[in-house]
Amino acid sequence: MARSNRCVPQNSSIVQIPIEEVFKTQLKSRWQQITMSSASSPPPPQVFVPEPLFSEPPPPPKAPVNVSLSPPPPPRSPSTSTPPRLGNRNPPPPASPSGQEPTTPTMTPGFSLSPPSPSRLSTGAVVGISIGGGVFVLTLIFFLCKKKRPRDDKALPAPIGLVLGIHQSTFTYGELARATNKFSEANLLGEGGFGFVYKGILNNGNEVAVKQLKVGSAQGEKEFQAEVNIISQIHHRNLVSLVGYCIAGAQRLLVYEFVPNNTLEFHLHGKGRPTMEWSLRLKIAVSSSKGLSYLHENCNPKIIHRDIKAANILIDFKFEAKVADFGLAKIALDTNTHVSTRVMGTFGYLAPEYAASGKLTEKSDVYSFGVVLLELITGRRPVDANNVYADDSLVDWARPLLVQALEESNFEGLADIKLNNEYDREEMARMVACAAACVRYTARRRPRMDQVVRVLEGNISPSDLNQGITPGHSNTVSVRLDARAVRVKPHGEMDSRWGRFKRTAQRYGGDSL
């Protein structure tokens, strides 16, 4: 095809390029074919945004099929549009007379060949990634927080335990160590056959009593937990409540409520303490007997305390008694049999059959409570450490005086001289009768604790404490002195009185003390 030698003026807006008639005919025919093909075929998917059609710069000229040329900037009139390229089938573009390549405007036959705008896809992807990432981060934080819970005192053994119940909880060894100032002597409240008791203050400010059992106990973890699970269900106003426990390696710790006004031993035998008046002594006797009776009569299975003593009877500010330290009590699985166990307890409170053979029943607790009643009556300790009286124990010293007091209603030799005879004689007679019945030598002749409670409260007669005697037929608690306890006396007066004590016992058919 011959090129035109005419030059295009630079200042003209549109320059018409003359071409041969044949080229015009072919171009017109091709354009009609493209138009008919576009009309017959379905329209392409609308994946473009038509707005930027005239705002974008025109592409480089590669298919100069338009009959007119326009200098940049490109015209905005749609009449200057040309059909798209048809590949190699397009005719070669005409050359300008000056040898320069002609400029071809943008072609828009109803669709764009440029890539689709990614605006909508990018928004959806960002939203999806944000939600997924947020869920992943939250899940990761949850597991990290659960895994990295604070641990108390890594140097201490790791605690093991099960939740006791709704009102109880487990404690770590570190928590109890901090609560008791590392079990310091300043926090030591007392020491018994089972271990040491410390005062502690928990993180919430509550005061507790922490009992640290002696290491080396043969009691296994399952046995300990089973026993603790039972006593955790016991709730009585005259029993110290169990708060929780801790098992850490070989360590066994019990956590009890803290009773602020010390123990009966402190108030009764403490050095420099004022004399406890009689009404308070009776109140303590009644309330403590109720707590012990609950263990024996209302628990199923019944619970044997094994270490009833003045030091385990706590006093609140109203002088109500709470029986403590039953956390190591022996559970009697059969009410008709005894439990053979290693002797545990405090000398001076042990029942004869328990100390001799280890045979344990609830009547062993009854004997120990009788010793506590003798302490309240006499003001003496259960064992004479200073050898003030010749007998080895308070019970041995009190046996003959108990009979005299019951027969003659003479309590001067038995009652605490610090009371200065300031006591109710009827109340004293009831307490003496209970003490005498509780410390009987034969276990089966001792009364039940519910009987002791009713006698102390004045609801039944002291004669109902007698075994084998119809209630109401006797006005005296039948007793017989153990000859061994009497004949060790250095004074002949005791031996001379033995005959009268023996005749009294035979008259009422009683049993030995």
Curated annotation (Swiss-Prot):
SUPFAM superfamilies attached to this UniProt entry: Protein kinase-like (PK-like)
Domain Protein kinase: 183-334
Domain of life, per lineage: Eukaryota
Phosphotyrosine carried by residues: 256, 354
UniProt xrefs under SMART domains: S_TKc
Tissue expression remark: Expressed at low levels in inflorescence bolt, flower buds, siliques, roots, seedlings and leaves.
Residue segments, region Disordered: 27-119
Positions with biased composition (Polar residues): 27-36, 99-111
Annotated Pfam families: PK_Tyr_Ser-Thr
UniProt topological domain (Cytoplasmic) ranges: 145-513
Extracellular topological domain residue ranges: 1-123
Gene Ontology molecular-function annotations: ATP binding; protein serine kinase activity; protein serine/threonine kinase activity
Cell location: Cell membrane
Family: Belongs to the protein kinase superfamily. Ser/Thr protein kinase family.
Name by which UniProt lists this protein: Proline-rich receptor-like protein kinase PERK3
